[in-house]
From Swiss-Prot:
Species the sequence originates in: Mus musculus
This protein's name: Egl nine homolog 1
Region (Beta(2)beta(3) 'finger-like' loop): 218-228
Comp. bias regions, Gly residues: 142-157
Domain notes: The beta(2)beta(3) 'finger-like' loop domain is important for substrate (HIFs' CODD/NODD) selectivity.
Region span, Required for nuclear export: 6-20
Positions of the Fe2OG dioxygenase domain: 271-369
InterPro entries: HIF_prolyl_hydroxylases (IPR051559), Oxoglu/Fe-dep_dioxygenase_dom (IPR005123), Pro_4_hyd_alph (IPR006620), Pro_4_hyd_alph_FE2OG_OXY (IPR044862), Znf_MYND (IPR002893)
Protein task: Cellular oxygen sensor that catalyzes, under normoxic conditions, the post-translational formation of 4-hydroxyproline in hypoxia-inducible factor (HIF) alpha proteins. Hydroxylates a specific proline found in each of the oxygen-dependent degradation (ODD) domains (N-terminal, NODD, and C-terminal, CODD) of HIF1A. Also hydroxylates HIF2A. Has a preference for the CODD site for both HIF1A and HIF1B. Hydroxylated HIFs are then targeted for proteasomal degradation via the von Hippel-Lindau ubiquitination complex.
GO BP term, example: regulation of modification of postsynaptic structure
The encoding gene: Egln1
Subunit relationships: Monomer. Interacts with ING4; the interaction inhibits the hydroxylation of HIF alpha proteins. Interacts with PTGES3 (via PXLE motif); thereby recruiting EGLN1 to the HSP90 pathway to facilitate HIF alpha proteins hydroxylation. Interacts with LIMD1. Found in a complex composed of LIMD1, VHL, EGLN1/PHD2, ELOB and CUL2. Interacts with EPAS1. Interacts with CBFA2T3 and HIF1A.
SMART domains hit by this protein: P4Hc (SM00702)
A Pfam family reported for this protein in Swiss-Prot or TrEMBL: zf-MYND
Taxonomic superkingdom: Eukaryota
Length: 400
């Protein structure tokens, strides 16, 4: 791999973005395939599990990636003016989710690579070598100069309006242009304080009655899962006793997505997962950088609703940091109460949850692209094996 300058062993930011475990999407402490040197895995076990598929495309030398990056809009730098004021169609007010960036410097260039050569053809044990440290560098490594800030934030009440926008207007005039331009969209004050409080009460009741279990990985054959993700989760359909307001939240999300139908990239969204209700217990756990859908399992949009009143990230941490592909910038999203977040689920948006030092609740739903979902043969990334819930076209839309 080489940078645009052509120097040997120098990685561009976009090349670093494409380094993730081919099986689970993890982006830290990766091992490189010793044969093609263009695929990565978080452990030997995950490479073995993926070898049957990978060996069909694994070739010696610097083979290019099998699939190019999707030709979708990326997160763009903010327009001229005040730093951090990224707007979608001029409709949204600035969010309070500040983003920071650093520009990688020459010191981040990778050294000449070393490691085992290509494996003998037909080898049953796939070759693997440790990915050099500099190639695992963050998009925003220490030592670089400060860059432009990026704020994907926005509000449910753009331009200082005091009345919430109807769902159709919010979807078409804010969410669609914001997603297609930036790939990230934040809506504040989504359902209102009273409804948000009711959802929080239902989630805490689930937690208090022992409904949560440790977040699962694709493979549980090692003891390192808690080092990767420290949350506890439960899956909710929305019809369970005591989860009526969570069901209302899911219906409200569905309404927004339905209004966006056919306008979010090239996707044809026709279903979603159940809701994953997650809790970080506040003991300093987080979730390392990863990609929700690195292997085309059908998920195209990640939608997260936060439930944390009076959250102060300076004290409690818990920020969701998104590293948009190909950008020397990252977007920091604070998990604030009644905040709704959308972003593309594929490798355009690697992200991490930074350590949380107070109890942190969130509800996540993933929406499916019909065509990609139909092509997906292995359904293992969602934890519920891609449970599909139909979006009923005759659902009565609600203003939110």
């Amino acid at each position: 791999m080489a940078s645009d300058s052509g120097g040997p062993g120098v990685l561009s930011a976009s090349e670093r973005d494409r380094q993730y475990c081919e099986l689970c999407g993890k982006m830290e402490n990766l091992l490189r395939c010793g044969r093609c040197r263009s695929s990565f895995y978080c452990c030997k076990e995950h490479q073995r599990q993926d070898w049957k598929k990978h060996k069909l495309v694994c070739q010696g030398g610097e083979a290019p990636r099998a699939q190019p990056a999707p030709a979708q809009p990326r997160v763009a730098p903010p327009p001229g003016g005040a730093p951090g004021a990224a707007r979608a169609g001029g409709a949204a007010r600035r969010g309070d989710s500040a983003a920071a960036s650093r520009v990688p410097g020459p010191e981040d260039a990778a050294q000449a690579r070393s490691g085992p050569g290509p494996a003998e053809p037909g080898s049953e044990d796939p070759p693997l070598s440790r990915s050099p440290g500099p190639e695992r560098a963050s998009l925003c490594p220490a030592g670089g100069g400060p860059g432009e800030a990026l704020s994907p934030g926005g509000g449910l009440r753009p331009n200082g309006q005091t009345k919430p926008l109807p769902a159709l207007k919010l979807a078409l005039e804010y969410i669609v242009p914001c997603m297609n331009k930036h790939g990230i969209c934040v809506v504040d004050d989504f359902l209102g304080r009273e409804t948000g409080q009711q959802i929080g009460d239902e989630v805490r009741a689930l937690h208090d009655t022992g409904k949560f279990t440790d977040g699962q990985l694709v493979s549980q054959k090692s003891d390192s899962s808690k080092d990767i993700r420290g949350d506890q989760i439960t899956w909710i359909e929305g019809k369970e006793p005591g989860c009526e307001t969570i069901g209302l939240l899911m219906s409200s999300m569905d309404d927004l997505i339905r209004h966006c139908s056919g306008k979010l990239g090239n996707y044809r969204i026709n279903g979603r997962t159940k809701a994953m209700v997650a809790c970080y217990p506040g003991n300093g756990t987080g979730y390392v950088r990863h990609v929700d859908n690195p292997n085309g399992d059908g998920r195209c949009v990640t939608c997260i609703y936060y439930l944390n009143k009076d959250w102060d990230a300076k004290v409690s941490g818990g920020i969701l940091r998104i590293f948009p592909e190909g950008k020397a910038q990252f977007a920091d999203i604070e998990p604030k109460f009644d905040r709704l977040l959308f972003f593309w689920s594929d490798r355009r948006n690697p992200h991490e949850v930074q350590p949380a030092y107070a109890t942190r609740y969130a509800i996540t739903v993933w929406y499916f692209d019909a065509d990609e979902r139909a092509r997906a043969k292995v359904k293992y990334l969602t934890g519920e094996k891609g449970v599909r819930v139909e979006l009923k076209p005759n659902s009565v839309s609600k203003d939110v």
